[in-house]
From Swiss-Prot:
The UniProt record lists the keyword Secreted: yes
Disruption phenotype: Deletion of the gene in vancomycin-resistant strain V587 leads to significant defect in kidney colonization in the mouse model of catheter-associated urinary tract infection (CAUTI). Double deletion of hylA and hylB genes in the same strain leads to a significant colonization defect in both the kidneys and the spleen in the mouse model of bacteremia.
Molecular function GO terms recorded: carbohydrate binding; chondroitin AC lyase activity; hyaluronate lyase activity
Family designation: Belongs to the polysaccharide lyase 8 family.
UniProt subcellular location: Secreted
Name the UniProt record assigns to this protein: Hyaluronate lyase HylB
Organism of origin: Enterococcus faecalis (strain ATCC 700802 / V583)
Classification via CDD domains: GAG_Lyase (cd01083)
EC code: 4.2.2.1, 4.2.2.5
Keywords, alphabetical: Lyase, Secreted, Signal, Virulence
Alphabetized InterPro entries for the sequence: Chondroitin_lyas (IPR008929), Gal_mutarotase_sf_dom (IPR011013), GH-type_carb-bd (IPR014718), Lyase_8 (IPR038970), Lyase_8-like_C (IPR011071), Lyase_8_alpha_N (IPR012970), Lyase_8_C (IPR004103), Lyase_8_central_dom (IPR003159)
A GO BP annotation: carbohydrate metabolic process
Top-rank EC class of the record's enzyme: lyase
Reactions it catalyzes: [hyaluronan](n) = n 3-(4-deoxy-beta-D-gluc-4-enuronosyl)-N-acetyl-D-glucosamine + H2O; Eliminative degradation of polysaccharides containing 1,4-beta-D-hexosaminyl and 1,3-beta-D-glucuronosyl linkages to disaccharides containing 4-deoxy-beta-D-gluc-4-enuronosyl groups
Length: 1004
């Protein structure tokens, strides 16, 4: 037998050579010999090298080849558009296998031809794709089955279509999945398929002009083209998805697991008891206060999912309860047939129909497994596929409660977190429908969302993350994106669908740059949470932190080893501060399991602060500094980045959160927490220079406001930085109405370890209210005792104004003090105020009537109603005590070299620090440094070496020239794009495409 196999292989090779690689065709004797061992295709195309020989039976088709394969396109002949082309290189046969591998690009009406008679134009049979998941089978003479349901092809995907025709039996497979089988094909006219025709194979195009890219074509005897059974892989993918949600294991000695399961069980029991099970019901559970009709859909499916979680989680009192499973399925039927989630119509917010409901729906189907019949699953997945046909299409938002036909936004492609949400649904559908095309599309579609961008939505080189075109959104939309991408990569890992390792690493690197510097005690800084800051939190923490922790652990699962350990160490550091919170706030079993494993893993210590130093996110106008004792953040805006976002009646008073708002965290435990946003004075946010004129709550559809100014940015190096913003409120709108606001100012922050030096200059504007700079506005911790001390003594009055050299908000708790030093004596107003508020007042989409109370100490500098060239200077000293503050003030270590609207500069000799912001487009000179254009610069002196770090904060300069004091003999190093002219002692810096990033010169 072994010799016979070798002989067959040699004959096959000889035949291929004599055919000139048109494709391999075996003789009858060779085929018979081969069949005694294993059936093989008798024809395999070689389209990249040869078009081959073709005959057009019907119409005319143009054919050409290139490295991508064969291209075939029908042409119009009179009124006829149909072409039937048979391949003369393939053997004629009456029964056999015919396989076509092709790239689908949105075409309709194309397919395979078999049993084609070379002499008769009306004797051939075809299996073809029409469109939208509809297929057809038949032959000329009106013998057609034209509405065969099957997979919907997705544009951009490669497919393998196999038709197995054996007598009157037809089977068709797409990517090895059987989707049509008919033991004896009968046509509507009562006749059956002709099974005695001996004929050729080929391609049919009809109904419209189209062009098809065929990668390969094979034909041979029945069974010669193997069908790979991938059902086991789909089961594994489904099990991975299911294991993220529920567990079939239970350990009664694990208290965290016991508590988690008990919580699920209790919630489900209550929901089961309160569910409306009447035969003529109009709802499952009553409409919740504040819910719109479309939001109610998401709520109803969320509750059904909670029932499913209890059903699928071992240890629950409802585990594997058949009655509960029937109740859930009955509820799904009700939502599809009675509440309109049937894939045909919709109303209200697109998000509920395409994201809110589908993810819960899919989770339920994954958990219930075979409790859902194949017939019902097909109904459910067909409905889901109608709302989410692919990850790219988004529905319009329509009026609530009035059903309309599905209306996808034309010429629109989803981006960012919305793309990943939709991709996750497509992945789930692909798993349930065993559709490799959908799974591949889900994976390929998310690559765009983590590829670096230079404008619009997505990740930037510096770690910025933008959503809605110009809103910093790392904390909310960014988290959603990371969760979605993370789940897709985790589920498809170690399968035939896994993403290329290089792309996975790119994603992980983006997560590293974007997230770790923006986390304080496990929570994302509010300055990157967008309108989400106005949402009522769950009991305890805001939830953004826990979400980030769990998402980082998901990413760690598939991250390269070095990043895996880095993320796990970081998460453990933050989780150790409050482990019970993370164990009791898990979103699903996967979160709990990852948390338990991490906290009990002795090899991961979590002993080091994950990020220290400074980080400028120039592409989203955000800055952070992290030291072991405090964290400092800045929220800015420019022509590139919006000042805030309001929409869906959320964040109605976020007007000034981008006006230079300072976030200083120390150990007071309450700053910017759940009681802050409903109670803080929205006109007096810390760090801002503001026109306090009353504004109406933002209730228009979506509000974003950009500045006319481009000068926003700075430089960073280790734990030092220089940051600036040209503030310009001209053009500000309120609910779409242009305001007469005209406030302008130049604001700078010079950042050192333990010192934040704030300068303001060129403050001008007109208002009927007052223009103020808010030195700080601190929420006090009710559990601490506070005093307001100053160089003129303790301040007891609720409202006090006087000239001051320093102020101290003193606490009885370690590292909760805040000190303020004024380089020149400054009139400062000190206000003690108790404020009350609710989240409902600032957010109607996520309302809460709970009243919060906040006790505040506000320090402001008044500039009057018509300032023309006002200025300010102060230093924030987090955690300083009274003795050290007095010493600091007496030493006068901060030297303000310039505080004008042309140049702001600060020198701190002890730290070897010089910071400069030159605002003028034509540059300027300060401290022996001359630039011919606007620049942000920092000089750090260490012994005999000076390091100059600088950037173009306008992000518009192509080149500038820079001269520095000639107190050096050697240029040790300089960044790429810098040249030095010895004759003029001038550096020329190329900032093209720098996007606000820094360059550096080191001299000695």
């Amino acid at each position: 037998m072994k010799n016979r196999k070798i002989w067959v292989m040699l004959v096959g090779l000889f035949t291929a050579l004599t055919n000139g690689f048109m494709g391999t065709t075996l003789t009858f004797a060779e085929e018979n010999e081969a069949s005694q061992t294993i059936e093989q295709p008798s024809y395999i195309s070689d389209f990249p090298n040869q078009v081959g020989h073709w005959q057009d039976l019907v119409g005319t088709a143009e054919k050409k080849n290139d490295s991508a394969g064969l291209w075939i396109a029908n042409t119009k002949q009179g009124t006829n558009l149909e072409s039937v082309s048979i391949n003369l290189d393939a053997r004629e046969q009456s029964s056999g296998d015919l396989e076509l591998t092709f790239l689908y690009e949105g075409q309709s009406n194309f397919g395979l031809v078999f049993r084609g008679d070379k002499q008769k134009t009306s004797q051939w049979q075809s299996f073809a794709y029409n469109r939208d998941g509809r297929w057809q089978l038949g032959q000329p003479g009106g013998k057609w089955l034209t509405n065969i349901p099957g997979p919907t092809l997705l544009s951009g995907q490669q497919y393998k279509l196999l038709v197995r025709y054996d007598g009157k039996k037809i089977q068709t497979f797409l990517n090895d999945q059987l989707f049509y089988e008919n033991e004896e094909v009968h046509y509507p006219d009562g006749t059956s398929i002709n099974d005695d025709w001996m004929g050729a194979v080929g391609i049919r195009l009809f109904g419209n002009l189209s062009k098809l890219n065929i990668i390969s074509m094979k034909s041979g005897p029945v069974g010669s083209i193997p069908v790979i059974d991938s059902s086991a892989e789909y089961r594994e993918l489904k099990e991975k998805w299911r294991n993220q949600l529920v567990s079939k294991e239970y350990d009664s000695t694990n208290q965290a697991l016991v508590d988690y399961v008990q919580k699920i069980s209790n919630e489900a029991t209550e929901l089961d008891q309160t569910m409306n099970k009447e035969p003529n019901r109009s709802y499952l559970w009553p409409l919740e206060p504040g819910n719109t009709p479309s939001a109610d859909l998401t709520t109803q499916f969320t509750k059904l999912q909670k029932l499913a979680l209890a059903y699928g989680t071992k240890g629950s009192t409802l585990y594997q309860d058949d009655k509960l499973a029937a109740t859930i399925i009955d509820g799904l039927d009700f939502m599809v047939t009675q509440k309109g989630y049937d894939g045909k119509k919709y109303h209200g917010n697109w998000w509920d129909w395409q994201i809110g409901v589908p993810q819960k729906f899919l989770n339920i189907l994954m958990i219930l497994e075979d409790k859902v019949s194949p017939e019902k699953q097909q109904i459910y997945t067909n409905a889901l596929s109608s709302y989410v046909p692919d990850p790219f299409k988004q529905l319009y938002t329509k009026p609530q409660g009035t059903f309309v036909d599905l209306a996808f936004i034309p010429n629109f492609v989803t981006s960012g977190a919305n793309r990943t949400d939709l991709a996750l649904t497509v992945l789930g559908l692909g798993i349930l429908q065993k559709d490799s095309g959908k799974i591949n599309q889900a994976s390929s579609s998310i690559v765009d969302v983590f590829k670096l961008v230079t404008k619009g939505d997505g990740f930037y080189q510096d770690g910025s993350f933008i959503q809605h075109n110009n809103i910093p959104y790392t904390g909310s939309y960014g988290n959603v994106l990371v969760k979605g991408v993370g789940q897709i990569l985790a589920i498809t890992a170690d399968s035939s669908f896994q993403m290329d390792a290089t792309l996975v690493t790119e994603f992980v690197e983006n997560v590293d740059r974007a997230f770790l510097p923006l986390i304080y005690k496990g929570e994302m800084l509010p300055t990157v949470n967008g309108r989400s800051i106005s949402r009522a939190p769950a009991v305890g923490k805001t939830g953004y932190g826990s979400t980030t922790m769990y998402n980082l652990l998901i990413v760690a699962k598939f991250a390269p080893n070095n990043y895996q350990k880095k993320f796990q160490e970081a998460v453990k550091y933050w989780m150790k501060e409050n482990p019970d919170y993370y164990l009791t706030n898990a979103r699903d079993f996967n979160d709990l399991q990852m948390t338990m494993q991490l906290l009990t893993n002795p090899e991961i210590t979590g002993g080091q602060l994950p990020f220290t130093g400074t980080k400028l996110y120039a592409s989203m106008d955000r800055f952070v500094q992290r030291t072991p004792s405090y964290m400092f953040g800045l929220g800015l805006y420019s022509k590139r980045t919006a000042s805030f976002e309001a929409g869906n009646k959320e964040n109605k008073r976020g007007w000034h959160t981008g006006d230079g708002m300072m976030y200083v965290y120390n150990d007071d435990e309450v700053q910017f927490n759940s009681s802050y946003w409903p109670t803080v004075d929205p006109y007096r946010l810390p760090g801002t220079t503001v026109d306090t004129i009353s504004l109406a709550d933002e209730v228009s559809a979506f509000t974003t406001i950009t500045s006319k100014e481009q000068w926003v940015g700075g430089v960073t190096s280790d734990n030092q930085a220089v940051v600036g913003m040209a503030l310009n409120k001209d053009g500000t709108k309120n609910n779409g109405k242009l305001l007469p606001m005209n406030l302008q100012a130049k604001k700078s922050w010079f950042v050192l370890n333990g010192q934040i030096i704030a300068l303001g200059a060129g403050i001008k504007g007109d208002t009927e209210a007052s223009i103020e700079t808010v030195v700080d506005n601190r929420l006090l911790n009710d559990a601490y005792q506070y005093q307001v001390l100053s160089n003129i003594g303790e301040i007891h009055e609720k409202n006090e104004t006087s000239k001051k050299q320093w102020l101290l908000l003193k606490s009885d708790h370690s590292n909760a003090n805040m000190g303020y030093y004024f380089p020149e004596e400054t009139t400062v107003n000190v206000k003690s105020e108790t404020r009350k508020g609710t989240y409902k007042a600032i957010n109607e989409a996520f309302p809460s009537d709970k009243e919060y109370v906040g006790d505040y100490r506000t320090f402001t500098i008044q500039h009057g109603q018509h300032p023309t060239n006002e200025h300010y200077a102060y230093v924030v000293l987090p955690g300083i005590d009274e003795t050290d503050l007095k010493t600091y003030a007496a030493k006068k270590t901060v030297e303000v070299l310039s505080n004008t609207e042309e140049i702001q500069a600060v020198k701190q000799e002890e730290e070897g620090y010089l910071g400069v912001n030159i605002w003028s487009e034509t540059g300027g000179t300060i401290a022996g440094i001359t630039s011919n254009k606007a620049i942000s610069l920092m000089r750090k002196t260490q012994q005999h070496q000076k390091t100059y770090t600088f950037s173009d904060p306008t992000q518009t300069t192509k080149t500038l020239t820079l001269k520095i004091p000639k107190d050096y003999s050697t240029v040790i190093s300089q960044s790429d794009g810098i040249t030095y002219d010895d004759a003029t002692e001038t550096f020329t810096i190329n900032f093209e495409n720098a996007a606000g990033s820094s360059k550096q010169i080191i001299v000695e």
